Every structure is written in structure tokens, then in C-alpha cells.
């Protein structure tokens, strides 16, 4: 069969400005500034006319008139329907024709005028979030569905950009590629893709498709700072083709936005497409070969066009971009891609052929060979030393052990990953044997045994390697090399071109192209390990949602499964490491050895309820009161902050006889009935206004950034509202006033100078008591102040604390005066089952010890200033940063859409948090409008982690979210 593209050369039209101006004026009555728009083989010009913007399309004479008629008909077909996306419309010329003809330099061209769609091409954005990728797939599928009943003779044509003809395009134009090695590789890989497609072609559905839903043809509107695809332009590639090819074209165009992970780009586009127009298993099987085909034919086409138009900037950029995309696609193992894409839409991943049965053990095993746990949750990993070699060594017997395939593992530094092979540990010098027959070669430091047409055995960690063309089972390949942890790594790889690292992200799909070498490793047969599915975290989330109340929220839409913490880092089940910027519960850091030791010791001795008499309860209470000013000398021990604030409310009622409480607007104090009543945060208590009991009296939020009062007298002016309520209630009718000394729920907003002093004076003058809620902001987190109330230079009547008091072990406290405390006795005794338990108090004392010994309050000053300075510098470049609140390591980055109106950037904040999680930083929004990034990491955070946070925030704000 002849190649329809052999010898076909299609240079773009190049009409000069004067001619274009005449066409617009004479035929369409349009005039104004012109701007050339890029195109591979047509000429497109935008005119900014007084009546609006329009696109003049000068079509290449190499394309059929019938095809142009089909394009116009398709645009009108869609424009006349209630489709969920925007499309351009063709406009008639002075003669009433939708297609006109002009002649330039002896060549006749078809010309059309179409409406211009407002927005920005998707191509102009760097980073594209998974939600945007899925939306792009949704748009492509929505267009295909809307065209499904469209028919026109012009749909049936042979087109260079039809992915069905990619092989012919590569054959016709590969000669334009000057890089001989690159050309040969491209031709070879294209042939492999075509071979796979030939076997599937009969199962691939054909339908009318736009076939060019690419980033240059998709127009977006801004939605919460994200590009949101909502329009499609340029119907130049419209034809009847494979539906699966439509997906491939849509996906390949976006790979340039994420060259380091092309597979996830295609998976997300597929997910969006499949939700509208479901693909079959055969179509999903064909998708990666189609991706390869599109990438290869794009390179060949661009290189050929460059020969025709060597000075065209659009073509030059296309060549560079197409090569980058090709190289990214080229690195993805095909089996991995098929497996990931199948699982993305709920199809079973294809099964690999079974590896050959081992005919010889890999080594001569001793009698006892333990299985070694190197998982994220391995008990042998010391959180202090983080010596992963020692964690393995402690499990070995006489230096022997066997590792696990498909296991999520930690790394000594940075991210871990999932193991693509397994290893055995053995004394140095142990001979390593070929388990099966095969050909052997050395590749770098590895020995590679080619077993059959599917499998390669890759062995690392050997010395004295013996390489021969063929080996029989039992042939010595080398010996275990000397090293800190001697052993050999075995990987069974079903891919001839790539060998994966030992640890990879699960999303890479490498577990679909490798197998467990268990049978070839173990001293006795054991079943191959089946790794957890790639969507394991999502499955666990489904189980969580099925068994837990919906009100019990979780971070993130698709949260990682976190199973380990160390210091200021969190680790998911696959070994991915995250900088933890939100965990003020573990104030010392995760897995603190002193807290672990104290809790373990106490658990071995005693843990019981607080009615028993034991030393830890007294010792912790004495230490706590020593940290507080007089006359705060009497302690109630509880378990949580909500419980602490509930006790504080009871103390107020018992001591004053009044139930009336003043609380600050938009604050949060807990989830119990009483504390919920005094919490008016919109996010935490959206029904506060309608459900507020009569004894709760809300005063103006003393927020000098968002509130009505600013300047040096703001504290007094906000306190006027406290005085107003006190006056309305009257002396003797005021129970108390509760406030966080630093406005934690608003993101660490510092109260105006003098506010608490004035508010406390007004309340006390009326016979009321003042509660400082230090649950979030106290305990040294502010750096310069151990307690938040110190920053306001006041002493409360009651202080509540919890959350960080036991570094994650439930323990909280209410501290007041002896006189106030004794008033509660008149109502009966006080008891909290686990409040002040021996274990809780042991953890709390260990926490106080470490705060002092490790200088963590001073670290909060230093690192907090570093973060604030870095964010303030970013604010000079990014107006979305309205201000930086707080002190020490209780900070809030308030995001706004307008620095004058302070319109909250709520959706942007959530998108930024999602993007930062992808980049390895855990941060969350807070505040009434959920537009403040809360920065309250463990106080052990160091400069490197703070800089990582700043770097990730910089990238996110620069490249998008």
C-alpha cells in the first residue's frame, strides 16, 4: 500500500499584512490591529475590530474544500445545541458565504472568519493540576459526545494529524530528522506501537472527533486561580477517527506541562474523558501505543515542517517541544503504562507472563533465613538515629535475611518508594548463582541475565563478576561484594529497555512491569508477594467513609495514607516524605524519643484513672503552675482542649453565679455543647448565629487586618464593644469573657495592643472572670512568649491548655486560683477519667523537659522569623499574599484576591494546599473564609525544612496550582 504522505509537503500560507487587511475590510467589513497566531500549516490572524475580536483563517490549499465545509457545519451544529462548553461560529462574508476564495501570488486560498472566544489558551500555563487535567479530558469527551450524531462527507478524509496514520507519517518524514540515532530509535519504537495497534484496530470504535483538543486549542477561564477549560477552537483536524486516538491527542498535548511524569498526565486526562465517554478495555489497552504514536508523528511532522519553514518561530518552538515530549514518553515502560491506565478507570491490570521456574537457588542457604521488614512501619527503625542499615542488620541471623518485593520503604534522606525487587543479605564473598539459564552481560554495576523474550533478571551488589554469553542454572555469576550491609539485589523486569530504580513511586507503574523474585531468592518456596494496588489509599478512604461519621473530616480531597512521623516530617505508606507545617499537636516533633520512653516506662508501671493517688499527677501540676504567674496556682487535669474550656465555663458559673459569657466573633473553643455555643467560627460552627443560646454574647472580632479598626487606638476601639455588652448586661450579671490571646482560628492574628487589658478590666469591673484559651497558641510556640497572654501583658483568671501538652498524648489542663477552683466544689466533685492519667502526665513532663533542653522556644523565634521574612519577600511579587500574621511558629499567610477589598482567596488557598502537598509539604487553610495558610509546625523544624516550605510556596505561586 502506498504511503499517502510520501512526498507531501505543505508549507503554510504567508499573505502579507496589506493583503490580509484588504480581505478583512472588503469581505467582512472589519478593521483594526492585527496579530498573527501560530499554526502548523494554515495562516491565522486575529483582528481587533471596534465590534469585537475575530479570527481570519487562511486555509492551506493542500486541504480539501469539503473538509472546510465539515468544520463550519460542526461549529454550527455545536453552537445550536445546549453544550456545556463554548465554540466559535463561522461568519458570512459580504456575499453571504461562509467560505470565500482569495488569490495571492498565483495561489488560491479558502478564507473564513470566525468569532473569537475570550479567555486564555491552556498552553500559556505552566503547571496543570490533576483537576485541570481531568477537566481537559472532560472537555475532549464532551465535544466527542456532542459530535456523535454529526455527519458530513468531509469527515472521511486522510489527514496527517490523524493518529491512525502516525506510522505512515513517521515513515514519510523521518528523513527530515538530522539526528541519526534519534531518528532510528523513533522509527523503531513507532513500528512497535503500530504492531500493537494492528492487533487491536478491529476493536477500536470510530466516531466524529475534533481530534485536536490540545492546549493551544483549549481556551480557559480563571477559576480560583486555576485555568478552567471551557472552550474549544480550531476545528481544522475534524474527522472520523478512533475515539481512543482522541484521548491520546488530548493527553499528549499536556505532557509538556509535566515532563517528569507523563503517565500521570495521560491517566488524569483519561479519567476525565472516561467519566463522560467510557472507553472499552481494548481502547485503554491501545491508549499508550497511541500516545507513543502521536508523540512520534509530531516529532516527524515538526521536523519536516522546519525544513519547509526554517525561520518560522512557531515551527521552531514546536520542534523543541515535540522532542521534549517524545523523550518523556519514551522513558515510560509500556507495561507500566497499560497497568496504570487500566486501573485508572477500574479495569484489571493486564497480567504478566509467569517467570520461568527457578532451576537452582540463587545462593546456598543456611538453615535459618529470616524475612526482613523494611516497610514504612518497621518496628526496628530508630526514629532518633534513622539508621536504616541498622534497622535491617538487627533482623539478620548471622548476616542472612531476605527482603520483600512491592514494599513501601523509607529512605535515609528524602523520599522512599516501593521496592521493584527484593534482596538477600549474606556475608561478603558468598557466591551468587544463576537461578535459570540465560545470556549474561554486565550493565554498569549490575549483572543482567536475559531469561526469555519477556524477562530479565537484574542483579546488583556483586563483585568478581563472571560474564559469559550463556550460563546454565547454578553457574556462579559473582560473589556478594563488601559493604556496610552486604547482600545482593534481584529484580525481575519485564522490559528490555529500562531497569527501574530499586525504590519508585507507586504511581510510576513499575510494579506492572516487574515481578517478585521470591521463588528465586528464598531458601524454601514461598508465594510471590502481591503488592497493594495503586489505589490502596483511596480504598482505605472508602472504608473510612463507610464506617466513620461524615462530620469527622480529613485533610485533602485525596489524602495520602500517613503511617509514620519523625521530627517535622510525615511519611506515607509508600515512603513519600512530607514537611509537616500544621501539626501543633506534636510540638516537639513526631516520635520524640523522650516522650516515647516516658510513656513506655509508665505503661509498664501503671496507667489508671485520676482518682488514684500517684506521683506523676502531682509532679506535672507543680511544674505547670511554676510556669504561670501568680495567683494561678490550682490545676484541673483533663484530656482535650474542648474539655478544658468546658471546665472553664463551669468554673465561671460556679464562681460568679452567672451563665452569661462574652466570646469573640469568629473564634473556636471546642466541640462540646458549651464550647460549641461560644464558638462562632463559620468554618467550625456554621449555624452559630441561629443556634446561639441567650447566655452567649458575641463581641466584635479584634482583627486589625480585617476588622473595622486599625491604627494605634484599635485595641481600645475594639474593647469598646466589650464595654458595650458589659453595660447592657449590668454589674453582677457578667459571668466571664473568653478569648485566645493570639487569634489562632484566624491564622495567628495578633490582637491590637492593649485590647485584652481593656477587655479584662471591663469584665472584672462587672464581677466577671477572664479566660485565656491557650490550647493552640501557648506553650512556647510564639517564641518570644511562653504564653499568649504574656504578649498582651495581662494575667487571666483561668488558663486552658491541651493539644500539644503531651506531644500527642491526650492531656490538658485548666489552671486558676484556689478561690475560684474551690467554688466548683460546691457543685460536687470533679473527675475526668483519663485527664491526668499516669501516662498522660509522664508524657506532659517529658514534653516540658524537651522544650527546655532542646531550646525549642528559641528555635520558634529563629525559624519563625525566617519563614515570615521569606513569605514577606514573596508578597512583593505575588499580590495574592495579603499579609503574614502571628509570631514565632504560629503564623498565618492570609490570601486575598484584592489587597484593597480583602476579598478572601478561599478556593485559591485550597488549590495551593493541594499543590504543595504534591510537592511534599503539608499545609492547610484556616479562618472563617478558609483563606489563611496556617503555619504551626513542630517546634523542632530546622532551617532546611523551612527553606523547603518557602521553595515549594515559591514554585506554587509562580507556576500555578
Q: What residues fall within each predicted segment?
A:
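An alpha-helical support segment within catalytic cores of ATP-dependent transferases
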Residues: 13-24, 151-152, 169-211, 221-224, ...
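Conserved N-terminal phosphate-binding loop of PLP-dependent enzymes in the Aspartate aminotransferase
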Residues: 529-961
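ATP/Mg2+ or Mg2+-diphosphate-binding catalytic cores
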Residues: 4, 8, 175-176, 298-351, ...
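A conserved alpha-helical element in kinase catalytic cores
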Residues: 58-107, 125, 130-134
Amino acid at each position: 500500500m502506498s504511503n499517502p504522505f510520501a512526498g507531501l509537503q505543505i508549507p503554510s500560507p504567508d499573505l502579507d499584512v496589506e493583503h490580509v487587511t484588504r480581505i478583512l475590510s472588503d469581505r467582512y467589513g472589519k478593521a483594526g490591529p492585527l496579530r498573527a497566531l501560530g499554526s502548523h500549516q494554515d495562516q491565522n490572524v486575529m483582528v481587533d475590530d471596534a465590534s469585537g475580536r475575530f479570527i481570519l483563517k487562511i486555509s492551506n490549499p493542500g486541504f480539501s474544500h469539503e473538509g472546510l465545509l465539515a468544520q463550519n457545519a460542526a461549529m454550527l451544529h455545536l453552537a445550536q445545541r445546549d453544550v456545556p462548553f463554548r465554540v466559535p461560529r463561522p461568519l458570512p462574508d459580504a456575499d453571504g458565504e461562509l467560505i470565500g476564495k482569495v488569490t495571492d501570488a498565483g495561489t488560491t486560498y479558502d478564507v473564513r472568519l470566525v468569532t473569537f472566544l475570550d479567555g486564555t489558551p491552556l498552553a500559556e500555563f505552566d503547571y496543570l493540576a490533576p483537576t485541570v487535567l481531568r477537566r481537559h479530558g472532560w472537555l475532549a469527551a464532551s465535544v466527542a459526545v456532542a459530535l456523535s450524531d454529526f455527519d458530513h462527507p468531509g469527515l472521511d478524509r486522510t489527514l496527517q494529524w490523524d493518529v491512525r496514520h502516525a506510522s505512515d507519517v513517521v515513515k514519510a518524514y523521518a528523513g527530515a530528522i538530522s539526528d541519526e540515532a534519534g531518528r532510528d530509535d523513533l522509527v523503531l519504537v513507532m513500528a512497535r506501537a503500530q504492531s500493537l495497534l494492528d492487533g487491536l484496530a478491529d476493536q477500536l470504535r470510530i466516531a466524529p472527533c475534533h481530534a485536536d483538543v490540545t492546549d493551544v486549542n483549549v481556551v480557559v477561564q480563571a477559576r480560583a486561580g486555576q485555568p478552567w477549560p471551557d472552550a474549544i477552537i480550531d476545528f481544522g483536524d475534524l474527522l472520523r477517527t478512533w475515539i481512543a486516538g482522541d484521548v491520546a491527542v488530548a493527553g499528549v498535548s499536556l505532557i509538556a506541562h509535566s515532563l517528569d511524569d507523563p503517565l500521570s498526565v495521560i491517566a488524569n486526562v483519561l479519567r476525565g474523558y472516561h467519566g463522560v465517554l467510557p472507553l472499552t478495555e481494548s481502547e485503554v489497552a491501545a491508549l499508550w501505543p497511541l500516545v507513543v504514536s502521536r508523540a512520534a508523528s509530531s516529532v516527524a511532522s515538526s521536523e519536516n515542517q522546519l525544513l519547509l519553514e526554517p525561520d518560522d518561530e512557531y515551527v521552531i518552538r514546536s520542534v523543541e517541544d515535540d522532542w521534549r515530549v517524545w523523550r518523556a514518553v519514551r522513558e515510560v515502560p509500556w507495561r507500566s503504562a497499560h497497568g496504570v491506565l487500566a486501573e485508572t478507570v477500574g479495569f484489571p491490570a493486564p497480567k504478566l507472563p509467569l517467570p520461568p521456574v527457578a532451576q537452582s537457588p540463587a545462593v546456598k542457604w543456611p538453615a535459618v533465613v529470616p524475612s526482613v521488614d523494611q516497610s514504612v512501619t518497621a518496628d526496628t527503625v530508630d526514629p532518633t538515629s534513622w539508621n536504616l542499615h541498622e534497622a535491617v542488620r538487627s533482623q539478620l541471623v548471622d548476616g542472612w535475611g531476605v527482603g520483600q518485593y512491592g514494599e513501601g520503604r523509607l529512605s535515609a534522606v528524602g523520599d522512599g518508594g516501593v521496592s521493584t525487587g527484593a534482596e538477600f543479605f549474606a556475608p561478603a564473598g558468598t557466591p551468587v548463582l544463576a537461578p535459570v539459564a540465560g545470556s549474561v552481560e554486565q550493565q554498569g554495576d549490575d549483572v543482567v541475565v536475559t531469561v526469555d523474550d519477556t524477562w530479565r533478571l537484574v542483579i546488583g551488589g556483586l563483585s568478581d563478576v563472571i560474564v559469559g554469553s550463556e550460563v546454565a542454572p547454578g553457574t556462579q555469576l559473582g560473589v556478594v561484594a563488601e559493604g556496610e550491609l552486604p547482600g545482593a539485589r534481584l529484580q525481575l523486569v519485564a522490559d528490555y529497555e529500562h531497569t527501574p530504580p530499586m525504590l519508585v513511586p507507586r504511581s510510576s507503574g513499575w510494579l506492572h512491569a516487574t515481578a517478585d523474585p521470591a521463588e528465586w531468592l528464598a531458601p524454601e518456596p514461598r508465594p510471590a508477594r502481591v503488592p497493594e494496588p495503586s489505589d490502596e489509599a483511596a480504598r482505605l478512604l472508602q472504608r473510612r467513609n463507610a464506617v466513620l461519621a461524615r462530620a469527622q473530616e480529613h485533610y485533602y480531597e485525596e489524602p495520602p495514607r500517613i503511617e509514620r512521623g519523625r521530627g517535622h516530617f510525615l511519611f506515607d505508606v509508600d515512603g513519600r516524605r512530607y514537611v509537616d507545617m500544621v501539626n501543633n499537636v506534636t510540638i516537639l516533633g513526631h516520635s520524640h524519643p523522650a516522650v516515647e520512653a516516658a510513656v513506655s516506662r509508665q505503661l509498664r508501671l501503671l496507667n489508671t484513672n485520676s482518682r488514684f493517688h500517684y506521683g506523676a499527677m502531682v509532679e506535672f501540676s507543680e511544674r505547670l503552675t511554676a510556669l504561670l504567674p501568680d495567683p494561678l496556682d490550682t490545676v484541673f487535669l483533663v484530656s482535650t482542649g474542648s474539655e478544658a474550656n468546658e471546665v472553664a465555663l463551669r468554673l465561671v458559673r460556679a464562681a460568679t453565679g452567672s451563665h452569661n459569657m462574652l466570646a469573640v466573633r469568629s473564634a473556636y473553643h471546642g466541640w462540646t455543647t458549651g464550647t460549641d455555643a461560644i464558638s462562632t467560627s463559620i468554618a467550625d460552627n456554621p449555624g452559630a448565629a441561629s443556634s446561639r443560646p441567650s447566655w452567649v454574647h458575641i463581641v466584635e472580632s479584634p482583627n486589625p487586618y480585617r476588622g473595622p479598626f486599625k491604627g494605634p487606638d484599635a485595641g481600645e476601639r475594639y474593647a469598646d464593644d466589650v464595654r458595650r455588652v458589659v453595660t447592657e448586661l449590668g454589674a453582677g450579671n457578667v459571668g466571664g469573657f473568653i478569648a485566645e490571646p493570639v487569634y489562632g482560628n484566624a491564622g495567628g492574628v495578633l490582637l491590637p495592643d492593649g485590647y485584652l487589658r481593656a477587655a479584662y478590666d471591663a469584665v472584672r469591673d462587672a464581677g466577671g472572670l477572664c479566660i485565656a484559651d491557650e490550647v493552640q497558641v501557648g506553650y512556647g510556640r510564639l517564641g518570644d512568649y511562653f504564653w499568649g497572654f504574656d504578649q498582651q501583658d495581662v494575667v487571666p483568671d483561668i488558663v486552658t491548655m491541651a493539644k500539644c501538652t503531651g506531644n500527642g498524648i491526650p492531656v490538658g489542663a485548666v489552671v486558676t486560683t484556689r478561690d475560684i477552683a474551690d467554688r466548683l466544689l460546691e457543685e460536687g466533685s470533679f473527675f475526668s477519667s483519663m485527664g491526668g492519667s499516669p501516662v498522660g502526665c509522664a508524657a506532659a513532663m517529658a514534653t516540658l523537659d524537651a522544650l527546655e533542653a532542646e531550646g525549642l522556644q528559641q528555635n520558634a523565634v529563629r525559624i519563625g522569623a525566617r519563614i515570615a521574612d521569606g513569605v514577606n519577600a514573596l508578597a512583593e511579587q505575588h499580590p495574592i499574599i495579603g499579609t503574614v500574621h502571628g509570631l514565632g511558629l504560629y503564623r498565618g499567610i492570609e490570601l486575598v484576591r484584592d489587597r484593597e477589598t480583602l476579598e478572601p482567596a478561599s478556593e485559591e488557598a485550597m488549590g495551593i494546599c493541594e499543590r504543595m502537598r504534591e510537592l511534599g509539604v503539608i499545609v492547610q487553610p484556616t479562618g472563617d473564609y478558609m483563606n489563611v495558610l496556617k503555619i504551626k509546625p513542630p517546634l523542632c523544624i530546622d532551617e532546611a525544612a523551612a527553606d523547603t516550605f518557602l521553595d515549594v510556596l515559591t514554585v506554587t505561586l509562580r507556576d500555578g496550582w
